[in-house]
Curated annotation (Swiss-Prot):
Keywords recorded for this protein, A-Z: Ribonucleoprotein, Ribosomal protein
NCBIfam families: rplS_bact
Entry's family note: Belongs to the bacterial ribosomal protein bL19 family.
Organism phylogeny: Bacteria, Pseudomonadati, Bacteroidota, Cytophagia, Cytophagales
GO cellular component: cytosolic large ribosomal subunit
Keyword Ribonucleoprotein: yes
HAMAP family: Ribosomal_bL19
Gene3D superfamilies found in the cross-reference section: 2.30.30.790
Organism: Cytophaga hutchinsonii (strain ATCC 33406 / DSM 1761 / CIP 103989 / NBRC 15051 / NCIMB 9469 / D465)
Protein name, as recorded: Large ribosomal subunit protein bL19
SUPFAM superfamilies to which the protein is assigned, alphabetical: Translation proteins SH3-like domain
Amino acid sequence: MSNLLKIVEQDYLAVQKALPEFKAGDTINVHVKIKEGAKERIQQYQGLVIQKRNSGNGASFTVRKISAGIAVERIFPTMSPFIDKIEVLRAGAVRRARLFYLRDKTGKNARIKEKKKPVVEAAK
């Protein structure tokens, strides 16, 4: 049975959507398809990635945002057909894979420094 699952997973991973590389600590904008009756629209969910689970087709990531002073966390399956696209807005400089300690912090204490990018000198 496990061999059959591996074969099916390989087929799905071969046709996997081209998603950008991101990790815990990055600020991302997820475009989610929302169905309301017969209509379908796209809603943007912007927040901080606090964890990323990589396990084949069961991969998922958790995004945390503050909305009207209330923290909201949402778990997105990576292979979900409801995800239209993902944009990486900022790369955070963190040393952990799971940022659950941010749940206890508020305001300025919950900020994450931005990762420094290497300076490219102009060609003369």
